Regions:
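A solvent-exposed, acidic/Ser-Thr-rich amphipathic alpha-helical stretch
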Residues: 19-21, 27-71
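Short N-terminal micro-motifs specific to bacterial/archaeal maturation
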Residues: 13, 42-43, 95
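General secondary-structure edge motif
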Residues: 2-3, 32, 39, 76
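Hydrophobic alpha-helical segments, principally membrane-spanning helices and signal/leader peptides
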Residues: 1-3, 13, 33, 63, ...
């Protein structure tokens, strides 16, 4: 898998605010973890693309100026880490694990406080 190309497509999808485009990178049974989800949905672990769609829809609504700039891409075995900055210059990292079909099956987001 070309992780650098994935990161470029991931950044472009997020910056488009097109949920279908964003979710196109994720498997139906994806597991997503983020402390930021606690504020919007009451828990930090989401299961399935529908739950992720509901969360990200609320997140995009709450931050209409949301944008990401990829800082670095770290390659692993069947996984990667994308470090990026958002529109407020907050550093974050997302660890993505991929299934055999190239879709994200597990994702964890961490943010600078």
């Amino acid at each position: 898998m070309d992780y650098d190309a994935f990161a470029i497509a991931w950044e472009a999808a997020w910056n488009s605010h097109d949920l279908d485009r964003i979710l196109g990178h994720y498997a139906e049974d994806v597991v997503f973890r983020s402390q930021k989800a606690m504020r919007l949905v009451g828990h930090g672990e989401l299961h399935g693309k529908a739950a992720l769609c509901a969360y990200w829809s609320r997140a995009l609504e709450a931050q209409p100026d949301l944008s990401f700039i990829v800082v670095d891409v770290l390659h692993g075995h069947g996984m990667m880490v994308i470090t990026y900055r958002n529109q407020r210059d907050v550093l974050a990292a997302e660890t993505l694990r991929f299934g055999a079909d190239g879709l994200v099956v597990e994702a964890s987001a961490c943010h600078k406080p």
